[in-house]
């Protein structure tokens, strides 16, 4: 009988990536297959996020639902991972004694041993340690699921922004070696992946070891990834302005595989608030980065994170944020009302902005961003956009869907053989959350890099002399 695994994931793309690795790992070691139905599962894993308000209560609410499944079948194993697990540790079992496994983001690779221990001893396992980058050496080869893929290049963060729990839950910055990253991406490319998104809490802080023992920069890594056959688009998230150096900007100037879209969080337009947040950069320094980026790549579009209602934020501070939003002309944002995360310095600050004022500021900010995003979309009307076709449209099974370089979803009529390939689409309609277009050019007509295997080249060029000896002419 097939053993089944159910994983519920909350939070960032790093968590999504980690969950996919858990599934691959447990299929390899224990033969588990994924199921969307918790009631069918032999193992239930909750991959948690501690960024949002009331994260802990959300976890215990979900565990309460799973408790009934455990009562019906005591052999079901329940595990809690992710940042809440890292933050709370044994306290989770204080409130939920039926939880069998508690593991952190850096110990998910030990899940097979933890499961075996629970089955063998019927005793719980807690491992929320921070072994340096060990998990990547223990995970199976990557498996592609479509033409896009996420690849984690580093873990943790050293910035210690006053509102953020990441350094406490994922540890300090540790970079994967460049060879490991390039190998993983090459394996994905061999399975048909065309676009890769490099992941890290502070991705441009990557300083990984090269094959010769030297230390590479993030700009070096971007160029290495761009040279991999089959990879035609590169994205990365998330960046920090303080380490967005000129050598990265130069990659935008000379590397077309790097998309014309960047998520670069600023959080606030007020230097006073930025200082209280521990951001170590000013609004002017942020604008200088954007100015240099647009000199290197004039069509680049920028998105950001914003926190409104941070302790001590005045109306004038908020107006400076709105001024920055207009000056940079952000295309998109992830914006939130401040809520204190336990254990962070900001949790000890006086939360003196009234809740209604926070909500009003958030509404004003999001409305402005939405207006700017719509203006960006309208500029695309009548233009030709290169789309990576991801699959069937959510709006109609008779249509295909894909994304532009600037992360717009485009729906269009096409044939199934286009999935996983690029098409050029003329934008004919603009909607708030998507675009519509018509195909004007397929990948075969684009003249993209031709990727051939060594075997096909040898087969095509093999010759034999009069003695029957094979010779090869490239």
From Swiss-Prot:
Lineage, highest ranks first: Bacteria, Pseudomonadati, Pseudomonadota, Gammaproteobacteria, Enterobacterales
Identification of the protein by name: tRNA-2-methylthio-N(6)-dimethylallyladenosine synthase
Family to which the UniProt record says this protein belongs: Belongs to the methylthiotransferase family. MiaB subfamily.
Top-level lineage group: Bacteria
Cofactor(s) listed in the protein's UniProt record: [4Fe-4S] cluster
Residues engaged in binding [4Fe-4S] cluster 2: 157, 161, 164
Chief location of this protein within or outside the cell: cytoplasm
Protein's cellular compartments: Cytoplasm
HAMAP family in UniProt: tRNA_metthiotr_MiaB (MF_01864)
Binding of [4Fe-4S] cluster 1, residues: 12, 49, 83
UniProt keyword annotation of DNA damage present: no
Annotated Pfam families: Radical_SAM, TRAM, UPF0004
Ranges for domain TRAM: 378-441
Catalytic activity: N(6)-dimethylallyladenosine(37) in tRNA + (sulfur carrier)-SH + AH2 + 2 S-adenosyl-L-methionine = 2-methylsulfanyl-N(6)-dimethylallyladenosine(37) in tRNA + (sulfur carrier)-H + 5'-deoxyadenosine + L-methionine + A + S-adenosyl-L-homocysteine + 2 H(+)
Oligomer and partners: Monomer.
GO MF annotations in UniProt: 4 iron, 4 sulfur cluster binding; metal ion binding; N6-isopentenyladenosine methylthiotransferase activity
């Amino acid at each position: 009988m097939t053993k089944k695994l159910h994983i519920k994931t909350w939070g960032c793309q790093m968590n999504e990536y980690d969950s996919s690795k858990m599934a691959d790992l447990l299929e390899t070691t224990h033969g588990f297959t994924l199921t969307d139905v918790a009631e069918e599962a032999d193992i239930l894993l909750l991959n948690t996020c501690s960024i949002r308000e009331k994260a802990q209560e959300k976890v215990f609410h979900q565990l309460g639902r799973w408790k009934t499944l455990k009562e019906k079948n005591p052999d079901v194993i329940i595990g809690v991972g992710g940042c809440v697990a890292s933050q709370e540790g044994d306290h989770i079992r204080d409130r939920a004694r039926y939880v069998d496994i508690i593991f952190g983001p850096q110990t998910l690779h030990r899940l097979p041993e933890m499961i075996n221990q629970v089955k063998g001893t019927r005793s719980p396992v807690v491992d929320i340690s921070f072994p340096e980058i060990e998990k990547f050496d223990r995970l199976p080869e990557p498996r592609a699921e479509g033409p896009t893929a996420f690849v984690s290049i580093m873990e943790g963060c050293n910035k210690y922004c006053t509102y953020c729990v990441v350094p406490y839950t994922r540890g300090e910055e540790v970079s994967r070696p460049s060879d490991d990253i390039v190998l993983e991406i090459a394996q994905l490319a061999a399975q048909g992946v065309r676009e890769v998104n490099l992941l890290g809490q502070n991705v441009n802080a990557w300083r990984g070891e090269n094959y010769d023992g030297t230390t590479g920069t993030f700009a070096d890594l971007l160029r290495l990834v761009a040279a991999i056959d089959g990879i035609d688009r590169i994205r990365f998230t998330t960046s920090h302005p303080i380490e967005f150096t000129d050598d990265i900007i130069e990659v935008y100037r000379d590397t077309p595989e790097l998309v014309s879209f960047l998520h670069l969080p600023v959080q606030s337009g007020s230097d006073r608030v930025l200082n209280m947040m521990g951001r170590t950069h000013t609004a002017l320094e942020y604008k200088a980065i954007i100015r240099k980026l647009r000199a290197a790549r004039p069509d680049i579009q920028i998105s950001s994170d914003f926190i409104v209602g941070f302790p001590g934020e005045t109306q004038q501070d908020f107006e400076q944020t709105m001024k920055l939003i207009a000056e940079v002309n952000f295309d998109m944002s992830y914006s939130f009302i401040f809520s204190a995360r336990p254990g962070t310095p900001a949790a000890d600050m006086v939360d003196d902005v009234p809740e209604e004022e926070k909500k009003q500021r958030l509404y004003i900010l999001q409305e402005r961003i939405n207006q700017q995003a719509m203006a960006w979309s309208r500029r695309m009307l009548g233009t030709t956009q290169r789309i990576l076709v991801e699959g069937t449209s959510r709006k109609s099974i008779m249509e295909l869907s894909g994304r532009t370089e600037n992360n717009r979803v485009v729906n269009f009529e096409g044939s199934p053989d286009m999935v996983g390939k690029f098409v050029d689409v003329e934008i004919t309609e603009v909607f708030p959350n998507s675009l519509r277009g018509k195909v004007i050019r397929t990948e075969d007509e684009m003249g993209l890099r031709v990727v051939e295997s060594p075997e096909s080249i040898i087969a095509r060029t093999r010759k034999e002399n009069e003695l029957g000896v094979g010779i090869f002419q490239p």
